Amino acid sequence: MDGSPEVTAFILAGGKSTRMGSDKAFVEFDGRTLLARVLDLARSVTQDVRIVGSAEKFASFAPVVEDIFRDCGPLGGIHAALRSSLSELNVMLAVDTPFVSWTLLQYLISQARATPDAIIVVPASEDRRQPLCAIYRREFADVAENALRAGNNRIDRLFDLVKTRTITEAELNVAGFSSGIFRNMNTPEELKTEEGRV
């Protein structure tokens, strides 16, 4: 061991929050900001927690990683996160998914440990992979960088380029997780509707 943590968690907080009308990270949900919720969640699985976003906005909350490829969406954030990481396993979490649980993260990490040849371990829900609640090994940074340099910002196009362990919705259900766990908050109306369900 070289002293680096086995797991680092990254909060992806660089979105524009256009539909929300204000920065999602600081929107309150059941009495706490979405950022505070996801920081606590991330810290429940590792002490090494970082925010991918603006240092000006987030430096007082946790160490911040800023995008190397600007305005390239989540793939740019994941790339920057992995370039900054010394960990083999890297948890990526969107700031606006308050229903993701500690038990789900532990499950994903255990699946990543059980499939050491998988570069990505990603759950699927309603026939869609959930790349913003997934585990990435550091080497995915090279794949992401090649795509970003070529102008391809779509992460879903990259899953087939590397060994990817997709956890099916059926597997998640057997493990006790519902598809609703990945719901994200995009509008004030969604926040209001979902409050009280955490």
Model-derived regions: residue spans:
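Dinucleotide-binding Rossmann-like beta1-alpha1 core, especially the glycine-rich loop
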Residues: 183
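Nucleotide and nucleotide-moiety/phosphate-recognizing core
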Residues: 2-155, 160-180, 192-197
